[in-house]
Amino acid sequence: RGLGDVYKRQDMNAIRRDEETDNIHSIFVDQWDWEKVIRKEDRNLDFLKETVKTVYKCLRKTEQYMAIQYDYIDLILPKDITFITTSELEEMFPDNTPKEREYYFAKAKGAICVMQIGDKLANGEPHDGRAPDYDDWALNADIIVYYPVLDIALELSSMGIRVDEKALKEQLDKAGCPCLLYTSDAAD
């Protein structure tokens, strides 16, 4: 298989003993993570958006299949997903919390992809917390849909392109963790 076609699946089962449980959160977690090997030149928003569209297409096909199997399931997902950055959400809803911004925009659009999560916004606060040593805050996204049964914005997927050396250094510095930075020269 060529580069970009290599996938790695991780299946995690965990107990989150401190989780606050509700309709969508439980103490037991069955989480599937997928990793795709990409080329350096694919570290960009266009590649991320194409990946989001592929995942969203699968979600819509699953919804359609379930609606055929069970006649009481209504189709609620729109044909297309709407992309928006956390900064654009803040500009649209400056007086609301990040979760309220997601709710209002998801309710208006049906399915949204919130991008660029983790860095500080104009108000000095991040939209949501993200580890500085995992995804590149400029190249990550959450797929969120409006779920009318519970009248909520429901996150279905969180994804991102991993940090490279430059993004790692910048994000560790912004997170106040420069002590975690090292180079291969320092290890000698």
Question: Which residues are covered by each model-predicted region?
Answer:
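Active-site scaffold segments
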Residues: 31-35, 181-184
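Short, small-residue-biased leader/transition segments that mark boundaries at the very start
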Residues: 2-7, 185-188
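Conserved alpha/beta core surface patches that mediate binding of polyanionic ligands
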Residues: 4-31, 139
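Short acidic/polar capping segments at secondary-structure boundaries
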Residues: 16, 39-41, 118-120
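A generic structural motif
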Residues: 33-44
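Long, well-ordered alpha-helical scaffolding segments within enzyme catalytic domains
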Residues: 46-63
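Alpha-helical scaffold segments that mediate packing/assembly in large oligomeric complexes
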Residues: 60-96
